[in-house]
């Protein structure tokens, strides 16, 4: 509950557009292969209408995960049931879903609502029904209730989705997370906007607006700060901004390139690209003391650092082999190892949270696509089929990647599952959107 309280507090602090998504999500591939699940509308036990339909949030989350396909409510055998006590196992035998989510909402005081939900294993329930002995303790996978305010309905819907997803897959859900990105609208006097929003585009908040370019936002491991590059002072500078206090700290303002910041796993340092000593090289800056350490030293361009989960190595893009490829540098020894060989170029890489895979941009036959490589087998899989993909960022549970691409001549965000089955676009209403970054668990 402490984690949920922290997230809800941040959501209320930053919320500016709670009822409309700043980014639409258009699913383009993969829903047909998803696992069927039933999500019942939560029974409202008050007068008038509830503040928000929590079940709609849950259904949307499960669809966007690429893993589940909620069934049409009209085809469900029971209606208006809000608790496991009303569930009739025998009625659900021919539905074909593996699980059922149901719940209720009732007023619980001034701006307070008691939300209850149950997660039922329909396969176990049906097996018990056939045996003639139905016991909820055998098929009830989870049952919870929480008191929330009207402003917290959407966030608690994401929380329910996280629970359902983890119970059914064994993988932690990432619905209670946020994304950052840059919107560019050249019809405005200050066209560059640094934004954050819920992972699904709701609750968008503008952190900074500038007449000069903003780029490369990245989250701290605790989700409290954002580092980014700003040209607001007519040169590239790296800032770190606290999302709670809005305090901005300038971390790097050397002559030349100051770019591609990446927080260390402990949040104390930034890996960056600087050209202050000549060629672009990789450095690590202590955020508190501003102490700086040079990591690479080569005549070729070294850029786009990212951290391995253990904090002992960096992955980076380098042209030291003649064309952009991904390399690993051990921070203790300084030893550099080439990681990619397949395709013309490989760049913009990051390691998945479990340390087992690498996500990056692969160029083959002139097409830039998002790819995944298993670090054990070295097998590479191209995940996307578009042409100009860039800036991949991995969800904290490692199941999805958000990235920038071009659709109908316009820069948009898109998402793909790390197995390549599910794909979606996230177009913005006005302008173009790029440089996405997925937050850690919040």
UniProtKB/Swiss-Prot annotation:
Classification via InterPro entries: 6-blade_b-propeller_TolB-like, PD40, Tol-Pal_TolB, TolB_N
Domain of life: Bacteria
Signal peptide: 1-21
This protein's UniProt keywords: Cell cycle, Cell division, Periplasm, Signal
A Pfam family of this chain: TolB_N
Gene Ontology CC annotations of this record: periplasmic space
HAMAP family: TolB (MF_00671)
Family: Belongs to the TolB family.
SUBUNIT field: The Tol-Pal system is composed of five core proteins: the inner membrane proteins TolA, TolQ and TolR, the periplasmic protein TolB and the outer membrane protein Pal. They form a network linking the inner and outer membranes and the peptidoglycan layer.
Name of the protein in its database record: Tol-Pal system protein TolB
Organism: Shewanella sp. (strain W3-18-1)
Gene name, Swiss-Prot/TrEMBL: tolB
């Amino acid at each position: 509950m402490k984690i949920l309280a922290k997230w809800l507090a941040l959501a209320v602090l930053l919320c500016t557009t709670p009822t409309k998504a700043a980014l639409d999500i258009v699913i383009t591939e993969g829903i047909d292969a998803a696992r069927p699940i039933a999500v019942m509308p939560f029974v409202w036990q008050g007068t008038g209408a509830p503040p928000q339909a929590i079940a709609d949030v849950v259904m949307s989350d499960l669809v966007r995960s690429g893993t589940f396909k909620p069934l049409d409510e009209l085809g469900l055998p029971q209606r208006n049931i809000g608790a496991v006590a009303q569930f009739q196992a025998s009625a659900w035998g021919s539905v074909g879903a593996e699980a059922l989510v149901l719940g209720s909402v009732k007023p619980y005081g001034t701006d307070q609502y008691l939300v209850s939900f149950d997660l039922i294993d329909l396969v176990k329930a049906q097996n018990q029904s056939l045996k003639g002995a139905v016991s909820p303790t055998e098929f009830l996978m989870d049952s919870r209730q929480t008191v929330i305010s009207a402003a917290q309905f959407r966030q608690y819907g994401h929380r329910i989705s996280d629970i359902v997803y983890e119970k059914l897959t064994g993988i932690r859900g990432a619905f209670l997370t946020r994304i950052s990105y840059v919107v560019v609208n050249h019809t405005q006097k200050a066209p560059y906007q640094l934004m954050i929003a819920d992972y699904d585009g709701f609750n968008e908040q503008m952190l900074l607006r500038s007449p000069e370019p903003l780029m490369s936002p990245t989250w701290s491991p605790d989700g409290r700060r954002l580092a980014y590059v700003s040209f607001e002072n007519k040169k590239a500078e790296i800032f770190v901004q606290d999302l709670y206090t809005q305090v901005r700290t300038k971390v790097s303002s050397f002559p030349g390139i100051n770019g591609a910041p990446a927080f260390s796993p402990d949040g104390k340092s930034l890996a960056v690209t600087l050209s202050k000593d000549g060629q672009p090289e990789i450095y690590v800056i202590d955020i508190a003391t501003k102490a700086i350490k040079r990591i690479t030293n080569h005549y070729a361009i070294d850029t786009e650092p990212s951290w391995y989960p253990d904090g002992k190595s960096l992955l980076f893009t380098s042209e030291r082999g003649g064309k952009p490829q991904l390399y690993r540098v051990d921070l203790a020894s300084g030893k550099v190892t080439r990681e990619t060989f397949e395709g013309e170029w490989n760049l913009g890489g990051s390691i998945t949270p479990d340390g087992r895979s690498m996500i990056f941009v692969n160029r083959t036959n002139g097409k830039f696509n998002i790819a995944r490589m298993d670090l054990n087998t070295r097998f590479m899989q191209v995940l996307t089929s578009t042409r100009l993909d860039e800036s991949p960022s991995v969800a904290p549970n490692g199941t999805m990647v958000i990235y920038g691409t071009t659709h109908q001549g316009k820069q948009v965000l898109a998402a793909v599952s790390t197995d390549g089955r599910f794909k979606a676009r996230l177009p913005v209403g006005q302008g173009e959107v790029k440089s996405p970054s997925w937050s850690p668990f919040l």
